Amino acid sequence: MTRSSNDNDFSQTPQPNRSSNVWIWIAAGTGCGCLGLFVLTIIAAIALPTFLNQANKGRQAEAKQYVSSMLKAQQAYRIEKPTFTNSLPELDLGIQPETMNYIYKIVPQPDKSKSVMVTAQSKITGLKSYTGAVFAIKKGADVTTVTAICESNLSTSRPPAMPAPPKDEKSLVQCPSGSQKL
């Protein structure tokens, strides 16, 4: 391939038809930029609710974990003593009664030797609330425990009610209306 001597000569004035193409490229680039911005806006509108939902799932995981830990600690406490405890510090878990997302409570039941309820009450709109229960059930001469965690079906600051106690250790705990068992 041979080069002409004019290929590297930049001293020549541009041809008129070539300079008018610059405005076409600028206009096309601006249009593409607007189209790109429009597409990004649509993607953001789709992704933002998903992102916020993931953040809420993380916050709800805190409540599920804390309620589960409180139930396990109540089971251990009940093995050592003839009743459940009403005191969060007695469980020795290091769980604070209140976090940024939830308020945690141990709700005493009429017969502290048979059952206990723990709750995670949502403080933030969009989060579900939780109720956990431990039931002590006689099995011959021994006592065994059955646990359940109920999650509210909708986001609410009201934890589900206490589930009904199972008839025996093989029966499933039924969560109250408006909640589901985890």
Predicted features, each with a name:
Residues 12-15, 54, 60, 65, ...:
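Residue-identity detector for glutamine
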